[in-house]
């Protein structure tokens, strides 16, 4: 009720929609995840996502997937729409035994081999229930084009209690560019054999890209063109790799696109 104007405003929520009392646009998902495990941080401007405390428990932030609930789902974020997504996440004080992912996918699964088309940032401390990398310390950028997989090693070593501002920008040619904390990083155009979980894979480093691309434009190479007309969904998630709860803070997630393709 607006006492100044005497106006009574009533909002009607869609029947069956999840957790609309908390947030009209987002919900939390994942193995053993509940709304009680998503809380406002007492120390920083963020939502704290905690896993429930068992191995492979997950905490995933997603747009409400109910039809008609939010523009985050009602609007299509297609690869042909010049989509730009960004978010700010903060790692916890303990970054062992966990997997973190943030970006654009078809499903909320952290496994790279699940989605044939995707573009997201990924960190994993080990290969258990995940992908086997030759190096488990950096942020990777993973994107897939109709089942062909690309893996970029950003060279950024993931640190505890640290803010990471991620941005993915897909241009009019459907080529992705990536930014971390305001700095652009090159994206490989060289495909790996495939993600299968067990086979060890190596991400193309920034130095390798610069050598084959241009040392004077070492951080500006875009990725290969993504498949046309693929509608992606923004997800941010964390999965515990042992019996201890894992957590991550999310300050914001934003997305935009061309009004008409």
Regions found by a protein language model. Give the residues of each.
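Beta-strand-rich, repetitive solenoid scaffolds
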Residues: 101-105, 120-124, 141-144, 169, ...
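Short carbohydrate-recognition loop motifs
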Residues: 36-60
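Short, tryptophan-glycine- and acidic/Ser/Thr-enriched carbohydrate-recognition patches
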Residues: 2-36
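Short tryptophan-centered beta-strand motifs in secreted/extracellular beta-sheet-rich domains
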Residues: 85-87, 162-171, 176-180
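Short, aromatic/His-centered strand-loop micro-motif at the edge of beta-sheets
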Residues: 142-165
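Secretory/extracellular carbohydrate-interaction modules
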Residues: 51-138
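Ligand-recognition surfaces built from glycine- and aromatic
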Residues: 199-261
